[in-house]
């Protein structure tokens, strides 16, 4: 069995395409590739005879209303009248309320501040817990020997203990290492 292939020639009609001259009024206003509503198509058709020129390079149009209301058109098609400073904008307008945006930003900042406070509190708890463990270990090591407070004032020992929250033994040791200097003793003990 053999198959045969036949070629069939169709008559194709040439379509007449009319080109508009750039001198025509409203030549820049044309139906875009986007799906347009019926009202938009009617508006474009009505504006073709006015003589509008398309303005390129505009990515966003914002119209401000009283009380902080904004109307934003993303990716607009903007046309300018050649006779006056009148602009016509096509696109989907979305309403934005600046007071709501400000409230949302304030709430977000508050949440971030609370998160930072929680992290700081956790880190302080962790450091104080590890510091308490170190203090217990140091006290256990030094509990066997008696405290030698010779050459150190009792008021200085109490002051170092209050400032650093350390044991009496550690305060005496820090004061002896710094030769009685309170500031250096506090820095060494902390």
From Swiss-Prot:
**GO terms assigned for molecular function:** phosphatidic acid binding; phosphatidylinositol-3,5-bisphosphate binding; phosphatidylinositol-3-phosphate binding; phosphatidylinositol-4-phosphate binding; unfolded protein binding
Note the PROSITE patterns from the entry.
NAC_AB (PS51151)
Record-level GO cellular component terms: cytoplasm; nascent polypeptide-associated complex; nucleus
Q: Which residue ranges have biased composition labelled Basic and acidic residues?
A: 30-40
**Chief localisation class:** cytoplasm
Function field = Component of the nascent polypeptide-associated complex (NAC), a dynamic component of the ribosomal exit tunnel, protecting the emerging polypeptides from interaction with other cytoplasmic proteins to ensure appropriate nascent protein targeting. The NAC complex also promotes mitochondrial protein import by enhancing productive ribosome interactions with the outer mitochondrial membrane and blocks the inappropriate interaction of ribosomes translating non-secretory nascent polypeptides with translocation sites in the membrane of the endoplasmic reticulum.
Q: Which parts of the sequence are annotated with region: Disordered?
A: 20-42, 123-155
Assembly and interaction partners: Part of the nascent polypeptide-associated complex (NAC), consisting of EGD2 and EGD1. NAC associates with ribosomes via EGD1.
Location of the NAC-A/B domain: 37-102
Which InterPro entries does the entry mention? EGD2/NACA0like, NAC-like_UBA, NAC_A/B_dom_sf, Nas_poly-pep-assoc_cplx_dom
Q: What is the lineage of its organism?
A: Eukaryota, Fungi, Dikarya, Basidiomycota, Ustilaginomycotina
What organism does the record attribute this protein to?
Answer: Mycosarcoma maydis
Per the UniProt record, one Pfam family is: UBA_HYPK
Report what the protein is called. Nascent polypeptide-associated complex subunit alpha
One Gene Ontology term from the biological process aspect of the record: protein targeting to membrane
For this UniProt record, the keywords arranged alphabetically read as follows:
Cytoplasm, Nucleus, Protein transport, Transport
Q: Where is the composition biased (Acidic residues)?
A: 138-151
Give the protein family.
Belongs to the NAC-alpha family.
**Compartments where found:** Cytoplasm; Nucleus
């Amino acid at each position: 069995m053999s198959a045969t292939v036949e070629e069939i020639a169709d008559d194709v009609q040439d379509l007449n395409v009319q080109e508009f001259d750039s001198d025509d009024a409203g030549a820049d206003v044309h139906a875009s590739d986007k799906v347009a509503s019926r009202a938009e198509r009617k508006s474009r058709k009505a504006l073709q005879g006015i003589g509008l020129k398309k303005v390129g390079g505009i990515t966003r149009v914002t119209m401000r209303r009283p009380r902080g209301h904004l109307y934003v058109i993303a990716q607009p098609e903007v046309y300018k009248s050649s006779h006056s400073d009148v602009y016509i904008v096509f696109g989907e307008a979305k309403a934005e309320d600046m007071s709501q945006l400000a409230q949302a930003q304030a709430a977000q900042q508050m949440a971030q501040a609370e998160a930072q406070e929680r992290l700081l509190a956790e880190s302080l708890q962790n450091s104080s817990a590890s510091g308490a463990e170190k203090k217990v270990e140091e006290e256990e090591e030094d509990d066997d020997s008696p405290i030698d407070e010779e050459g150190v004032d009792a008021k200085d020992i109490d002051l170092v203990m209050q400032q650093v929250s350390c044991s009496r033994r550690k305060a005496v040791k820090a004061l002896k290492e710094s030769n009685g200097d309170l500031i250096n003793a506090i820095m060494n003990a902390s």
